[in-house]
Amino acid sequence: MKRTFQPSNLRRARTHGFRERMSTKNGRKVLARRRAKGRKTLTA
């Protein structure tokens, strides 16, 4: 059986990257929460 996780840095960035987060209101909420929590890395 094929494994479900086939890593790709390009797909990772396009789906979970900074610009993708900034493109929606909820994505900006995600970034705000992660900043408030003090995360070292905000996005993938």
UniProtKB/Swiss-Prot annotation:
Record-level GO BP terms: translation
Gene3D superfamilies (alphabetical): 1.10.287.3980
Keywords: Ribonucleoprotein, Ribosomal protein
Stretches for region Disordered: 1-44
Any single GO CC term annotated in Swiss-Prot or TrEMBL for this entry: ribosome
Protein family membership: Belongs to the bacterial ribosomal protein bL34 family.
PANTHER family according to UniProt: LARGE RIBOSOMAL SUBUNIT PROTEIN BL34M, MITOCHONDRIAL RIBOSOMAL PROTEIN 34 FAMILY MEMBER
Name of this protein: Large ribosomal subunit protein bL34
Lineage: Bacteria, Pseudomonadati, Pseudomonadota, Alphaproteobacteria, Hyphomonadales
